[in-house]
Amino acid sequence: MTIMDVKDAMFHFASAPHRSMDQYTAIVFDSGDADPPSFHQVVAHVEHRARLVPRLGIRICEAPGHWEFPRWIRDPHPVRDHLVDHDLSDGRHTVESFLAELSSVPIDATDRAWKIHVGRGLSKVDGVRGAATVVVVQISHAMSDGSVGTHIARALFGRGENTENTALPDPVASRARPRYDAAKGAVLLPLRWARSQIPMVRAQKKYLAAVRDGELVVPAPVEAAKFNAHPDETRAVHVLQFPKSQWTGGPATVTVTALTAVGAALAEYCAAHGEPDRDDLRALVPTALSASVPWPAVNRTLPAAVSLHPQLADATRRASAIAEALAQQREHVTDHRHLDATRSAEVYPAALILGFGRHGRRTAPRTGTPDRVTTHTVVTSVNRTSLDLTLGSARAQSCSGVAALGPGCSVSHAVYGYGDLVTVCVAACPTTVPDHADYANMLRSAIDETCAALHGTATTAVRR
């Protein structure tokens, strides 16, 4: 995997100055009665741990003219050059404002594919006794999905000392050869195009036949909503924390519970903006592939478009319908015919794929709202309850993240389980959704009501 897979390359090129597609893992450490770690102590800790994470020793090298997919190369920068110190002791910052600032600025993966932001001196953080240390691991989506982010968080901050390299299917890094890659891609373009046609056509025909015969269900585009406006580079983040016990006890999973609440909140928001009776709301839910599925890309997730059924007033019926829709879409995206059709692009010439993508990004509208969309929002769900993260004597109070916004998506949701907490991070573009705080309050109420209906649990000791 010295040359990037097309799917990872798409994540790399989708990130732009006005749109970060990076992965963000935010960890809030509580030192209790002890002094919080200094920035130099955090650097020393990460330097010691990062040597056993080969994934953190690579970056990306692009070929001139994009005649070939980028290459994984070794990163010559020392670990300390990847850490950024942020003094948050001025009283103006919160965890939410800190995450909003970071999520609006993508990293340049051709220079450094990851950074660790260390926020020090943040006071009045719920659940933290003293000054909080907020560590945000920002990593290019081209080299990390949610599962990889969990492995990296455990390797860097997990309790106990690692003695072996973190077991990940790491890309093979080589020396940079941009001119060679470009020349080879240009010379081989006609041959690669010719060789790609038969397998691509065959795979696409099988997939489309399955869709036509009703064996696989592909949701048709539906009318867009207010929160489908194209976002600009500004970001706002709301962090909602709940006891894990509030989300358990009933038959619904945390993911289905979150989708049920999000559907109710989105429907309420639509009604407040003159769009009542929306029964077509959908969420994009990243679906992980099992380890047994042959997959050349670093990112082992595919998007599933899940109907939220807001027309069903009863939360139990709505959750059941959502669970069925989620299972149906997971079956769709993991079906061998869909996987074969997706993988068939691997043999297509890089220059043509990247050229089409570059043209699409250049001509795509940066403002306004599309007429129709496949999904209205994003809901990611990551289980990190198995982690026990520490930084010196400080213990992690929470571990969460931010889901990226993109074209036609101005509101996203990231659901994280860690310890005895479930954290829901709402990211929004304040330019296109100026009343994002109202939506966050709607979602909080919807979560309380949904958990009560599905799990028989009352609201208890919500920290934020």
Ranges and model annotations:
Residues 413:
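Hydrophobic/aromatic beta-strand elements that line small-molecule binding cavities or substrate pockets
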Residues 437-441:
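A cross-kingdom marker of C-terminal helix-rich interaction/assembly modules
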Residues 1-18, 22-24:
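General N-terminal leader/first-domain-start detector
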